[in-house]
Amino acid sequence: MKKYILSILITVLPTGLFAIAGFGLQVAQGQMKVEESVLGGADIPGVTLTNGAFENAFGIGAFLYVDIIPVIDLELDFQAMGNTYDINFVNPIGSMDPIPFAWATVNTYITVRKDVFSLSIPFLAAAKLYSGVGYNMHRTTPVANIEMVENLLGGDILGGDVSSLNENLEDFMTNEDNYDKSNGFHFQAGLQLKLLTFTSQLFYRYTMAEDVVPDKKGFGSMNFRFGFGI
């Protein structure tokens, strides 16, 4: 009898704790398509600055949720996401050595969630569909532009020496003081599965924020989480 009671407690206690809060890891597939941009040309004859195209992005991060407020849950997650592209520059003096660069963004999301539908096996497992809305903050590597390059060439974009421009431009764009900072809102919907103290989630999120993805006012992402209860 004692063994039977003990086995019930071992099962019930972690499950109860799991309902209070949880944490874990998160991976994401950013859904975006950034076209190649060519600056200069007709506006500045003999000068061309090209930022290459890229499609989608991979992200990784961590999350924390709290489930002690009636009706709603609160989530906080941090995520780094990125992809690579090339930067090229040409002026009448010569061509800059191409820069293999990374579009990268570090994101923080605060989300209020509400269950849409749920079912459970007492003390063992649960599943629920949910939706949520929230606020987000971003720090993103900048995109090279004509003004940026002109300043690095000492104000002479037509006749400036480009031999060390690739190093100077990369140093400028990777300096955190020059990152673009922005914020916005998002909505998401997904499925969460719980088994004892383990949880997994699969959800779609749409982020509405400027100055994150070049020339876009928002982007989508598919996200997967795996975590534990506390």
Predicted regions and their residues:
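Cleavable N-terminal export/targeting peptides
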Residues: M1-G22
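Short glycine/proline- and aromatic-enriched beta-strand/turn motifs that initiate or cap beta-hairpins
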Residues: A19-D67, G229
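Outer-envelope beta-barrel architecture signal
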Residues: A19-F23, F58, P70-L74, F123-L129, ...
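Gram-negative (and chloroplast) outer-membrane scaffold detector with strong preference
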Residues: V27-Q31, F63-L152, I230
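Predominantly the C-terminal beta-signal and adjacent terminal strand-loop region
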Residues: E36-V38, M81-D86, D177, S182, ...
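Flexible, surface-exposed loop regions and adjacent strand-edge segments
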Residues: L39-P45, F89-M96, A144-G155, K217-F224
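Extracellular loop and loop/strand-boundary signature of outer-membrane beta-barrel proteins
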Residues: D43-N51, I93-A102, F172-D177, A209-K216
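Residues that define the transmembrane beta-barrel architecture of outer-membrane proteins
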Residues: F54-I60, A102-T108, A127, K181-F187, ...
